[in-house]
Amino acid sequence: MPGLLLGDEAPNFEADTTQGGIRFHDFLGDSWGILFSHPRDFTPVCTTELGRAAKLAPEFSKRNVKMIALSIDSVPDHLAWSKDINAYNGDQPVEKLPFPIIADKDRELAVKLGMLDPDERDKDGMPLTARVVFIFGPDKKLKLSILYPATTGRNFDEILRVVDSLQLTAYKKVATPVDWKCGDSVMVVPTLPDEEAKKLFPKGVFTKDLPSGKKYLRYTPQPE
């Protein structure tokens, strides 16, 4: 099945959305971007997901991240459903979210991007879109891909955490360890020699002693 692999450039597709027609590369501009699909409008898990995405939209915006959703529903359905999403969030039930939703009624994009879930089908037996998350860098290349089944809602706080890690590690020679969150210490990448690490990280590099005697667990406070 067609799809995207890490490092692939995003296709410069055209699409109809709740905010008008777009060309994807123009939409992204020089920003980071998150493209996320959901199975259907007017369904319970999807409503909670897009509600949380809407609540976190200001945080993504602070990080220069543009968000755009996608499903096989029509633009009128997306707009009507937006009222329910806003009401779920306790906001005014208006036909507007802080990000556009793509109407991929013929499944053309879902097929091209590998977003279909073979186990979830509509009343006509056609596959629905899965819960996919693609994160693109300013170079339009895929930096992260996550695929969830229809039964499991996504954690958008985790997606925000991943963005923090991707942006930090894109510009600094560090990696983020398990359960890392912004402000925690990070790991110095193994390919960086000790002397260069000391120059790059003036706050200090701390190496954990290990039974193997190898010096690969090197920590440093998160660089600015």
Curated annotation (Swiss-Prot):
It holds the Pfam family 1-cysPrx_C. One of its GO terms (molecular function) is 1-acylglycerophosphocholine O-acyltransferase activity. Keywords: Antioxidant, Cytoplasm, Hydrolase, Lipid degradation, Lipid metabolism, Lysosome, Multifunctional enzyme, Oxidoreductase, Peroxidase, Phosphoprotein, Redox-active center, Transferase. Irreversibly inactivated by overoxidation of Cys-46 to sulfinic acid (Cys-SO(2)H) and sulfonic acid (Cys-SO(3)H) forms upon oxidative stress. Disulfide bonds: none annotated. The active site is at 46 (cysteine sulfenic acid (-soh) intermediate), 139 (for phospholipase activity). Its EC number is 1.11.1.27, 3.1.1.4, 2.3.1.23. It catalyses: a hydroperoxide + 2 glutathione = an alcohol + glutathione disulfide + H2O; a 1,2-diacyl-sn-glycero-3-phosphocholine + H2O = a 1-acyl-sn-glycero-3-phosphocholine + a fatty acid + H(+); a 1-acyl-sn-glycero-3-phosphocholine + an acyl-CoA = a 1,2-diacyl-sn-glycero-3-phosphocholine + CoA; 1-hexadecanoyl-sn-glycero-3-phosphocholine + hexadecanoyl-CoA = 1,2-dihexadecanoyl-sn-glycero-3-phosphocholine + CoA. SUPFAM superfamilies: Thioredoxin-like (SSF52833). The record marks 31 as: Important for phospholipase activity. One of its GO terms (cellular component) is lysosome. The modification Phosphotyrosine is found at residue 88. It is found in: Cytoplasm; Lysosome. Residues 30-39 are annotated as: Required and sufficient for targeting to lysosomes and lamellar bodies. It comes from the Eukaryota. GO terms for biological process: cell redox homeostasis; lipid catabolic process. Residues 4-168 form the Thioredoxin domain. The modification Phosphothreonine is found at residue 176. Thiol-specific peroxidase that catalyzes the reduction of hydrogen peroxide and organic hydroperoxides to water and alcohols, respectively. Can reduce H(2)O(2) and short chain organic, fatty acid, and phospholipid hydroperoxides. Also has phospholipase activity, and can therefore either reduce the oxidized sn-2 fatty acyl group of phospholipids (peroxidase activity) or hydrolyze the sn-2 ester bond of phospholipids (phospholipase activity). These activities are dependent on binding to phospholipids at acidic pH and to oxidized phospholipds at cytosolic pH. Belongs to the peroxiredoxin family. Prx6 subfamily. The active site is a conserved redox-active cysteine residue, the peroxidatic cysteine (C(P)), which makes the nucleophilic attack on the peroxide substrate. The peroxide oxidizes the C(P)-SH to cysteine sulfenic acid (C(P)-SOH), which then reacts with another cysteine residue, the resolving cysteine (C(R)), to form a disulfide bridge. The disulfide is subsequently reduced by an appropriate electron donor to complete the catalytic cycle. In this 1-Cys peroxiredoxin, no C(R) is present and C(P) instead forms a disulfide with a cysteine from another protein or with a small thiol molecule. Homodimer. Interacts with GSTP1; mediates PRDX6 glutathionylation and regeneration. This is Peroxiredoxin-6. It comes from Gallus gallus. The gene is PRDX6.
